[in-house]
From Swiss-Prot:
Gene3D superfamilies: Apoptosis, Tumor Necrosis Factor Receptor Associated Protein 2, Chain A, Cysteine proteinases, Phosphatidylinositol 3-kinase Catalytic Subunit, Chain A, domain 1. Keywords: Hydrolase, Nucleus, Protease, Thiol protease, Ubl conjugation pathway. It is found in: Nucleus. Residues 193-503 form the USP domain. Its EC number is 3.4.19.12. The gene is math-33. It comes from the Eukaryota. This is Ubiquitin carboxyl-terminal hydrolase 7. The active site is at residues 202, 442.
Length: 1135
């Protein structure tokens, strides 16, 4: 039984004779061979939990060992000197990975490996047991805890233990390890690099690697003229870039520029396509671009061959043949066991005899041989294995299909001067492998990157590499070839495309391209790109070490006459931005601000990285010098985060100095300032002749004073001051009057400006200290006004509300259902107060447009969310309800956009007498659109029809009469006609699931349509039967469901002809492919198909409920849906 050892078995008995690793072996190779000879085997098996390990070898950069363990079946432990019954002991045999105490622990990792654990036999067959396992850091051993019993192994007749010695061998292969601490260096380990996957572009990466190692193709791409196309859409330039970087770079290459040149967007990179189809489309695109240039014949010379289709008479000298070119050969896999057998079947001739004789013209009917032969073979032969087929269902054929490393196609060819036997010998160059199922999976490529060298030097061996997107690794020949034959039940992985190279063309088309042979124009272009990328990368790295700051000074604050201290848009757009190092200390920031504001000098060069002892000492000396200075300013960090417990209303943002930056501390900016962009307030003294007052963090509060002058009706920021939080406001009245320029005994009224939307009167009757009276920290704004000029209609709070609520609004007319001849009014802009009554604004609009204001509906919407108002909009009283944003802020939103509609009735009827509903209607051109109506709640279906007629674009020849159908919503299994409502049906009796405000919110809809003239009159024995479209399965509905009149006992052929006339936009050729069926109403199951050659007639008893008239079955039209899903879309290169 295959298992992992018990946890205690993972504890290694230290060994002291571990030799150094054999450097002659590739430590990052794919396979390894381990051996362990256990002498004194009987002694080893005499004690439970004895263990021994082999010398380690390195494979994939990880140490591997054999681990042998003695196990007691009965679980008892015995002394070495006691007599034991060894028949109770089992021999455990494991492969161990990455468990060497001499190596540093690697953390989380995973490595998949397969192995054969073998006990050698001196005279006969050895014991071999296979394992495959995904080793990881918590499960490093895998094998057999009961490989075999001691008695069995020691039986002298079997020859496994000779002279008390047992010989263990292990052959294993391992994939590239993965994990956070594993950085696989493909270039170092293989000399090659991979291509990054953009999402599902593994198919493209696979064929691009094959093209790259076909150096004749790479050389042709290098030599192509890039033309004058823009770089973004230049496929030739993008292909050159990919190949150049694969040759010159040391890390995996991006393919984004190539897919952009194809005209693909980011979503296209997540659509997986067929590698064969992509190969053909790309080669065709490049061949087209090569026409008329020196490389015109490059692709045909590489990939094009010719085959002859022939019919040759056996008894007369007559042959008919046709020669066609090919760029790949597609071979069946189903029923074939090998590539040789598939080629044989492809070119095997058949005999035309008896009733199938060939008409040889003048020779009459003759026995003949019909077949295909290759008359010219290309240097690079692409063999497409047809593993994806439709056999009733879409499936992948994963049968075993072998292919050789060397292939001779002489038996499939017509040899002659143009094609000798030497031209038929091919060597396998690449194997493109698909793992997965029909609708998805993963592509990798195996390439023999040493094929040219081994062809030139017979002593050189194959060097197969596995290209798995950005990971490239060495692999064995068996892994590249035999493992991809398919047929394994556990691994749905098999070769899908083979690339063979003609032996006599290897030297010409696989010869390496030295860097010196790359055209200078190509090298120059991409070297300049590389230098530009390096500069941008260095710039980005430096930017990550820097941060942006804005210095807000008192003069900037004093220029603000509106909300808060400073408009945030000015901070971001008008004030110059500075750049500082994140590793700066606060003292260095003070020096920087001093130099910028007072010395007007640039930032001095400081070694922020302390690159050596001298630089570190210089920086320490500079910091001491700066701290000894007396700066006449203070720095504050301005933030917009705050909370106010005394109100629950949502407040607008504000930007205030809230955190003092102390020059004397040894604090770095990256720990003090958390954002990449910060706003710094520079506090000066209000009086240039006075020094900056002291600041005590435990006592003082930084406050700004804003004065409202009723004479000028304007706010002015006078300056800032420090309030002792333990004192009362009245103690500062004379100081505030002096700052404003008022007499010292002037009575003042105080407000706290918490935010633009919240100005709070300070209640001085409560004899509280400032710290208890106001809920503010540093950065508060005290708004001051004179008591004697403050009135109930003119005061600071009233002015702030006026500034906050007065907005500019753009009014745009909207239509529920626009009449064909109706022209919209022009847009206009108007200033309104958000406290205005909505009807007042409607009256002004009515007077401006000369319409009844009672019919003016004003509403708004969030962009992209909805296009029409709901009932709630009609209940709004003030304009404030039109503001859709969570918090109104006139600083951020300079102009609002509001819709209005001119209704055909007074808007107060909507909530009282009418119901808003949305339905579909079918226009004369066949298109279906949405329609919003407001029928009376007590009305009937005829009221809905009459209201809709006002908007319908009637055309000549129509009936002018409407009907209302209940239909299913667009989920495909529900998209059908359920019933036709009578005109006298009360609106209150309609299925309430169809009466709603949003089309997408319900499973059932209503649809209005004009009644065809031939369906106006319904006689006894006639019935309107629903018709649906479906694609193979009755539940896969699509298209527009409709009804058609049928008559009892009429021929079904007449129904078919009537359907043909109704579907007049369908071509005769397409209609001929339609199949007809009857589907059950309830579950949309197939009742039976309709045949038209047996005189079948309509039986109404089968079609409708005779009491209600509700259809019991549907007529189903079975044909291919015109909707092509993205997963099925053909691959296209647009440029």
């Amino acid at each position: 039984m295959q298992c992992s050892p018990d946890p205690e078995d993972l504890l290694i008995v230290p060994t002291h004779d571990i030799p150094s690793y054999d450097e002659s072996l590739d430590p990052f190779g794919p396979e390894g061979h381990l051996s362990l000879d256990i002498d004194c085997f009987s002694k080893f098996m005499s004690r439970s939990d004895n263990r021994i390990m082999s010398k380690p070898i390195i494979v994939r950069g990880i140490p591997w060992r054999i681990l042998a363990i003695c196990r007691n079946q009965q679980g008892s432990r015995h002394s070495m000197n006691s007599r034991v019954n060894r028949s109770n002991f089992n021999f455990g045999f494991f492969l161990q990975c990455n468990n060497d105490e001499l190596l540093q622990k690697r953390g989380m990792w995973r490595c998949y490996g397969t192995a054969v654990l073998e006990v050698l036999n001196a005279d006969g067959p050895s014991i071999q047991k296979k394992i495959h396992h995904s080793f990881h850091n918590t499960e490093v051993d895998w094998g057999f805890s009961n490989y075999d019993q001691y008695d069995t192994l020691c039986n002298p007749k079997d020859g496994y233990v000779v002279n008390d010695t047992i010989k263990l061998r292990c052959r294993f292969t391992a994939d590239v390890p993965t994990g956070a601490n594993y950085m696989w260096d493909s270039k170092r380990h293989t000399g090659c690099i991979g291509l990054r996957n953009q999402g599902a572009t593994c198919y493209m990466n696979s064929i691009l690697q094959s093209f790259y190692f076909t150096t004749g193709f790479r050389r042709a791409v290098y030599n192509m003229d890039v033309g004058t196309e823009p770089n973004e859409s230049n496929i030739v330039l993008a292909m050159q870039r990919v190949f150049y970087e694969l040759q010159m770079a040391s890390e995996a290459v991006e393919t984004n520029s190539l897919t952009r040149a194809f005209g693909w967007d980011k979503l296209d990179a997540f659509n997986q396509h067929d590698v064969q189809e992509f190969c053909r489309v790309l080669l065709d695109n490049l061949e087209t671009k090569m026409k008329g240039t020196s490389e015109e014949k490059s692709i045909p010379n590489l990939f094009r061959g010719n085959m002859k289709s022939y019919i040759k008479c056996l008894d007369v000298d007559y042959e008919s043949s046709r020669t066609e070119s090919f760029y790949d050969v597609q071979l069946n896999v189903l029923g074939m066991d090998s590539l040789e057998r598939a080629f044989e079947a492809y070119t095997t001739s058949e005999i035309l005899d008896d009733e199938n004789k060939y008409d040889a013209g003048d020779h009459g009917l003759q026995r003949a041989e019909k077949g295909v032969k290759f008359v010219e073979l290309p240097p690079i032969l692409h063999v497409q294995l047809m593993r994806f087929q439709y056999c009733g269902v879409e499936q992948k054929i994963n049968e075993r299909f072998s292919f050789p490393e060397k292939m001779n196609l002489a038996s499939c060819c017509e040899l002659g001067p143009m094609l000798t036997e030497e031209d038929c010998v091919y060597s396998l160059h690449a194997v493109l492998v698909h793992s997965g199922e029909f609708h998805g999976g993963h592509y990798v490529t195996y390439i023999n990157v040493n094929l040219h060298e081994s062809a030139v030097d017979p002593t050189s061996s194959a060097k197969w590499c596995k290209f798995d997107d950005d990971v490239v690794s060495r692999t064995t020949t068996d892994d590249a070839i035999v493992s991809n034959f398919g047929g394994e039940k556990t691994m749905n992985s098999s070769a899908y495309m083979l690339v063979y190279v003609r032996d006599n063309a290897i030297d010409q088309f696989l010869a390496p391209i030295p860097d010196s042979q790359i055209p200078q124009s190509v090298s120059r272009t991409f070297e300049m790109e590389r230098l530009h990328r390096n500069r941008e990368k260095k710039k980005l790295e430096e930017e990550q070490l820097c941060m942006g700051i804005v210095l807000v000074t008192p003069d900037i604050v004093a220029s603000n006459h509106s909300f808060d201290l400073v408009d945030q848009s000015i901070v971001h757009d008008s004030i110059p931005h500075e750049t500082v190092w994140k590793h700066m200390f606060t003292a260095e920031l003070y020096q920087f601000v001093h130099d910028r504001l007072f010395e007007k000098s640039a930032m001095q060069k400081i070694d922020m990285f302390d690159s050596d002892d001298e630089a570190r000492q210089a920086r320490r000396d500079n910091l001491r010098r700066i701290k000894s200075k007396k700066f006449n300013f203070r720095l504050w960090r301005m933030t917009d985060s705050y909370s106010l417990e005394r109100t629950t209303q949502k407040l607008t943002s504000r930007l205030r100095p809230s955190e003092f930056i102390d020059c004397k501390t040894d604090t770095r900016l990256d720990t003090l300032l958390s954002q990449d962009f910060e706003t710094i307030y520079v506090e000066f003294s209000n009086n240039i002749e006075r020094p900056l007052c002291e600041y005590d963090t435990a006592r003082d509060l930084l406050f700004f004073v804003k004065y409202y002058d009723t004479m000028t009706d304007k706010f002015t920021i006078i300056g800032h001051t420090m309030f002792d939080c333990h004192k009362r406001f009245n103690l500062y009245r004379s100081m505030l009057c002096e700052m404003i320029g008022l007499p010292a005994d002037t009575e003042l009224k105080y407000y706290m400006e918490h935010a633009a939307s919240y100005l709070e009167l300070v209640d001085l009757t409560q004899n509280y200290s400032i710290g208890r009276l106001v809920e503010e920290q540093d950065g508060g704004i005290l708004v001051v006004e004179k008591v004697e000029t403050s009135t109930s209609t003119q005061n600071a709070k009233q002015k702030m509300n006026e500034l906050f609520l007065d907005v500019e609004v753009e009014f745009v007319q909207s239509f529920y259902n626009k009449k064909p001849e109706e022209e919209p009014f022009e847009q206009f802009v108007k200033r309104i107060c958000l406290d205005d009554k909505l009807f007042t604004v409607a009256e002004e609009i009515g007077a401006r447009l000369n319409v009844d204001p009672k019919k003016v509906l004003i509403w708004t919407r969030v962009s992209g969310s909805r296009f029409e108002p709901f009932f709630d909009d009609y209940m709004l009283n003030t304009c404030k309800g039109l503001m859709t944003r969570p918090v109104h802020d006139p600083r951020a939103y300079k102009r609002y956009r509001v819709q209005y509609a001119i209704m055909p009735f007074d808007i107060d009827e909507i909530s009282k007498h009418r119901i808003q509903t949305k339905l579909f209607w079918q226009l004369p051109n066949g298109h279906v659109e949405e329609l919003t109506l407001f029928p009376l709640k007590e009305g009937t279906v005829i009221d809905i029809i009459n209201e809709a007629k006002r908007y319908y674009p009637f055309v000549e020849g129509g009936s002018g009469k409407f009907r209302l159908l209940q239909i299913g919503a667009p989920p495909l299994s529900n998209q059908r006609v359920y019933q036709i409502y009578g005109e006298n049906t009360l609106i209150s009796d309609l299925d309430q699931r169809t009466m709603y405000k949003l089309v997408s919110s319900q499973a059932l809809h209503c649809r209005l349509e004009e009644v065809p003239i031939d369906e106006l009159d319904m006689s006894p024995g006639e019935f309107l039967c629903p018709v649906v479209h479906f694609d193979r399965e009755p539940t896969k509905l699509f298209g527009l469901s409709f009804v058609i009149k049928i008559r009892n006992n009429e021929l079904m052929t007449e129904v078919r002809d009537r359907l043909r006339r109704k579907l007049n936009d369908v071509s005769d050729a397409d209609f001929a492919k339609y199949k007809f069926a009857l589907l059950s109403r309830d579950k949309l199951q197939l009742c039976r198909t309709i045949e038209f050659n047996n005189g079948e007639k309509v039986n109404l008893a089968d079609m409708a409920n005779q009491t209600t008239g509700v259809p019991q079955v549907y007529i189903g039209l079975d044909h291919k849906s015109p909707i092509q899903h993205s997963s099925e879309a053909a691959i296209r290169i647009l440029n």
